[in-house]
Amino acid sequence: MGMLVPTALAARLLSLFQQQLGSLWSGLAILFCWLRIALGWLDPGKEQPQVRGEPEDTQETQEDGNSTQPTTPVSVNYHFTRQCNYKCGFCFHTAKTSFVLPLEEAKRGLLLLKQAGLEKINFSGGEPFLQDRGEYLGKLVRFCKEELALPSVSIVSNGSLIRERWFKDYGEYLDILAISCDSFDEQVNALIGRGQGKKNHVENLQKLRRWCRDYKVAFKINSVINRFNVDEDMNEHIKALSPVRWKVFQCLLIEGENSGEDALREAERFLISNEEFETFLERHKEVSCLVPESNQKMKDSYLILDEYMRFLNCTGGRKDPSKSILDVGVEEAIKFSGFDEKMFLKRGGKYVWSKADLKLDW
């Protein structure tokens, strides 16, 4: 009986010690867990415990936020007029209106684009030299280079209305002049609708090339490959003209422009297959400045502003306009542009586009 008392006492003391040890261990475990969180000791593959007060979907919210970042309009094509002096059968920006913004309103819109991140502006039409005999265009070009200090200012034109006087007045502010030339055969140009009576489109192209060299403007050629020129060999002509880029497009249908009931053109007869387009590219693979653009690459990879400064969404095979950036701002309007930035980069949309960086041998 005398032995039972010490034994019972020892058991009681052991039980109390175990309880205290358990409490101490629990406290240490909690402390260690917080140290791991604070010092970043958690395994990268394991989920970290949620801190009280932090939303459960923080990571998802951040990912969603990243995906809804506003699109930056790095490169924009501004079709400020739809009027043209040519009648190309496959044209996909036709003369459905005669509207042109007042010059100061156009400048205001360009300033908004600059503030949103614009680096390159490309003026197109229609025929951009048609408005005020090129003076409207020249003033916009000068404004973009001199006041907005854009790295690149370019123009796409059929070239028929350009005079040397324009180069003298505005050439220093222009980085790239792209001339549309679909064929070096005048009969083919006439079939396409790129002809003006006795004027020779090819001879005019050569004259423009000289002026670009004389006034230090980078020279570029755009060609739309279609049913009438798909078998042509342009190698020697392109090499002789030596453009900085030769953009080769596959003829494209846009509902309401060159296809469908409301269209001003019927381009179906100009269409070629993907295989025919690839054959043309293969024939010209030795031309180092060749930049091909199939219909797939063109789709949704351009930011296009129309004459009202509305972004045009072409994802549905037609041109659905946003509200004007002059009314709602760039960030709001660009949400409806349908722009595919990945395809823009994939097609080579970002390149050396400033003549200061091109370092050409004038």
Curated annotation (Swiss-Prot):
UniProt keyword terms in alphabetical order: 4Fe-4S, Acetylation, Antiviral defense, Endoplasmic reticulum, Golgi apparatus, Immunity, Innate immunity, Iron, Iron-sulfur, Isopeptide bond, Lipid droplet, Lyase, Membrane, Metal-binding, Mitochondrion, Mitochondrion inner membrane, Mitochondrion outer membrane, S-adenosyl-L-methionine, Ubl conjugation
Q: Where exactly is the Glycyl lysine isopeptide (Lys-Gly) (interchain with G-Cter in ubiquitin) cross-link placed along the chain?
A: K207
Q: Tell me where in or outside the cell this protein is found.
A: Endoplasmic reticulum membrane; Golgi apparatus; Endoplasmic reticulum; Lipid droplet
Q: What is its EC number?
A: 4.2.-.-
At the top of the EC hierarchy, this enzyme's class is lyase
Q: How is its activity regulated?
A: IRAK1 and TRAF6 synergistically activate RSAD2 increasing its activity with CTP as substrate about 10-fold.
Query: Quick check: keyword Signal in the entry?
Result: no
One GO molecular function term of this record is: metal ion binding
State the annotated membrane topology for this chain: Peripheral membrane protein
What is the recorded post-translational modification?
Acetylated by HAT1. HAT1-mediated acetylation of Lys-198 in turn recruits UBE4A that stimulates RSAD2 polyubiquitination leading to proteasomal degradation.
Q: Where is the Radical SAM core domain?
A: 70-290
Binding positions for [4Fe-4S] cluster per the UniProt entry = C84, C88, C91
Q: Which residues carry this modification: N6-acetyllysine?
A: K198
Extent of Polar residues compositional bias: 64-73
Cellular component terms (Gene Ontology): endoplasmic reticulum; endoplasmic reticulum membrane; fibrillar center; Golgi apparatus; lipid droplet; mitochondrial inner membrane; mitochondrial outer membrane
Which tissues does it occur in? Expressed at higher levels in atherosclerotic arteries than in normal arteries.
User: SUPFAM superfamilies this protein is in?
Assistant: Radical SAM enzymes
Induction, per UniProt? By interferon type I, type II and LPS. Induced by infection with Vesicular stomatitis virus and pseudorabies virus in dendritic cells, presumably through type I interferon pathway.
What chemistry does it catalyse, as a reaction equation? Answer: CTP + AH2 + S-adenosyl-L-methionine = 3'-deoxy-3',4'-didehydro-CTP + 5'-deoxyadenosine + L-methionine + A + H2O + H(+)
How does the cofactor bind to this protein, according to its record?
Answer: Binds 1 [4Fe-4S] cluster. The cluster is coordinated with 3 cysteines and an exchangeable S-adenosyl-L-methionine.
Name the Gene3D superfamilies on file: Aldolase class I
Report the function annotation for this chain. Interferon-inducible antiviral protein which plays a major role in the cell antiviral state induced by type I and type II interferon. Catalyzes the conversion of cytidine triphosphate (CTP) to 3'-deoxy-3',4'-didehydro-CTP (ddhCTP) via a SAM-dependent radical mechanism. In turn, ddhCTP acts as a chain terminator for the RNA-dependent RNA polymerases from multiple viruses and directly inhibits viral replication. Therefore, inhibits a wide range of DNA and RNA viruses.
User: Family, per the entry?
Assistant: Belongs to the radical SAM superfamily. RSAD2 family.
Q: What's said on domains?
A: The N-terminal region (1-43) is necessary for its localization to the endoplasmic reticulum membrane and lipid droplet.
Record's protein name = S-adenosylmethionine-dependent nucleotide dehydratase RSAD2
Native source species: Mus musculus
What is the primary gene name for this protein? Rsad2
